[in-house]
Amino acid sequence: MELRPWLLWVVAAAGALVLLAAEARGQKIFTNTWAVHISGGPAVADSVARKHGFHNLGQIFGDYYHFWHRAVTKRSLSPHRPRHSRLQRVPQVKWLEQQVAKQRAKRDVYQEPTDPKFPQQWYLSGVTQRDLNVKEAWAQGFTGRGIVVSILDDGIEKNHPDLAGNYDPGASFDVNDQDPDPQPRYTQMNDNRHGTRCAGEVAAVANNGVCGVGVAYNARIGGVRMLDGEVTDAVEARSLGLNPNHIHIYSASWGPEDDGKTVDGPARLAEEAFFRGVSQGRGGLGSIFVWASGNGGREHDSCNCDGYTNSIYTLSISSATQFGNVPWYSEACSSTLATTYSSGNQNEKQIVTTDLRQKCTESHTGTSASAPLAAGIIALTLEANKNLTWRDMQHLVVQTSKPAHLNANDWATNGVGRKVSHSYGYGLLDAGAMVALAQNWTTVAPQRKCIIEILAEPKDIGKRLEVRKTVTACLGEPNHISRLEHVQARLTLSYNRRGDLAIHLISPMGTRSTLLAARPHDYSADGFNDWAFMTTHSWDEDPSGEWVLEIENTSEANNYGTLTKFTLVLYGTASEGLSAPPESSGCKTLTSSQACVVCEEGFSLHQKSCVQRCPPGFTPQVLDTHYSTENDVEIIRASVCTPCHASCATCQGPAPTDCLSCPSHASLDPVEQTCSRQSQSSRESRPQQPPPALRPEVEVEPRLRAGLASHLPEVLAGLSCLIIALIFGIVFLFLHRCSGFSFRGVKVYTMDRGLISYKGLPPEAWQEECPSDSEEDEGRGERTAFIKDQSAL
């Protein structure tokens, strides 16, 4: 009987070590949850779940549901085929997938927090113009009022004195524990401080004497607790799709491991959540997803291998240090759109924000700190013009970001004269410029997509491969593009050492984008399977002409591989070049920079010029506008061209019931004066990976050597785990014999005079045996129980 407790501990430890070793080798860890597509509504889903022993955790979105089974192992190296097969045979089940635990890393650079004090936030209003020009946006009257931001992370401390005044329960949920409370789980190391820190950057309350001030200090702030548990496709999708017609902006500072060898991105449900967000969120204007570009700089990682930052639906944000340098943790890639400030070297200041346990910190770091600053600036911009679409916001970022004060050796001028860098995108966000341009912004034309198959037959990569193709960008077709936004090079290739590859794409106007730089830690022989490398560097260029793809082996090794598929995907509009400003006349008051602020009678203000007729998509309205003088801000009542509602092509007012005509994809209701949208067409499913190309026999020997080398890390990981297990067993047996301590079936880790945190159980629960994993959690009112063990081991 005395041996039973430590035998159980050894078995449990061995199982945990096996799972850890499997994760280290990249093996899939299957959970006891399923994502299920069921037709018929929630009642049918509940009925199917009950009939087959599942518990319906709730709706992900649409007809997709999250099922859990108490009898299935919580973490397993193999899928549970019997349960899967039974559910698959149900007629109402259209699709299902047992969920796989994913590795997602929070993107902050760890440092011990310092004592709180009231700080100076140098990045909001600096004396040397090394700031984000936020004070100018505040001076124009924009503080984020009416805008809702949600932080997708490990929860937020909703009762923090600097957050409570702006907390929004409608923008919050605990996906990990399936309840509305996003309060983080407390630990001794404060592991779950990440979301609270990010929230304070966006919307910390102003003028209350606590900590600092958020960029959008009158915005509403919420949080989704989704990183403090198993992160699956369903968990990500539920988080990304939370309340999309209430939340305007989602800020995420996490992603796949920044280890320089991972290639990973959103799976089926998360990808669908992104698409639904931009097409249906905010009443059809599109949810805005702000993403941290990644902290893998020290590992020579590339954010183009991260399918979240590499997505056209996310606004990817990088970091700059206080002195305008590239931080040591920053990743360079062509999908980054812009930059905000964050931490740098030891002599450079960091970011001030709220911290866990109702504290304040001056040490928030990494691209984790950059993305929330961008979310705050976007909140100010949305307050200036709530009718901006998700693509309008990206255009505003491109047109107003500033390369000044940012140091890098890769600044280049693209085909339309804009400076762009793989480390900074188009430069630092400028809050003042963004809100000024947003107020009279013309909604961009509907997005077009032109797909061009480039490769006719597989090509050997060798030392260097160059693929050239002249395209007309779908000329003569309804999806013809003459003004670019995003460009994707979708590549399928095999290669015996993926990390040695460097890939570049050159546009017809000469802009050279690095789609992939060499990654020394990536020893994988998996290659890429229809991976969409994305670049923003050719924004506003004309895509017609010759495109060049370059793939090269950066090492001296005799590597080998084959490019089997190359699809060029162009996104943009049919507009001819950049829109010229309207002819200026009828101006009554000009600023020193020759921008009109007041028009004569009979004229309306449009993009700092006066026009007699507002352009299509705008309507004249008399509004209070903010005019910044040298020492003050004056409020002037003037006629301004304001945007029509996003559903209207032309209008007589800003409301959705003021439409006079509709876009081509919608029809006008002459009675209600509204435009009804046509349903979205379904997306094509991803093509299957082609079979591997046959190799000459002379290549068998190097391939075998590469295979043996690639398994060396797995062998070392296995041996390490075995040694750790032996040491653990010996030490545990010795301590057990010395202390005579008996566990009596209670699963509690103890340390001498240590505080042990355990989420969801009140203190009295420790006097009884722990409930099984299958039982319903109780006592949710107390989020953390601290147990102080007085026994000496």
From Swiss-Prot:
A motif (Cell attachment site) lies at residues 498-500. It catalyses: Release of mature proteins from their proproteins by cleavage of -Arg-Xaa-Yaa-Arg-|-Zaa- bonds, where Xaa can be any amino acid and Yaa is Arg or Lys. Releases albumin, complement component C3 and von Willebrand factor from their respective precursors. Its EC number is 3.4.21.75. The active site is at D153 (charge relay system), H194 (charge relay system), S368 (charge relay system). Disulfide bonds join C211-C360, C303-C333, C450-C474. Its main location: Golgi. The chain crosses the membrane at residues 715-735. A motif (Trans Golgi network signal) lies at residues 772-778. Residues 160-186, 673-698, 766-793 are annotated as: Disordered. Induction: Up-regulated in cardiocytes in response to stretching for 48hr. PANTHER family: FURIN, PROPROTEIN CONVERTASE SUBTILISIN/KEXIN-RELATED. Belongs to the peptidase S8 family. Furin subfamily. This is Furin. It comes from Rattus norvegicus. The lineage of its organism: Eukaryota, Metazoa, Chordata, Craniata, Vertebrata.
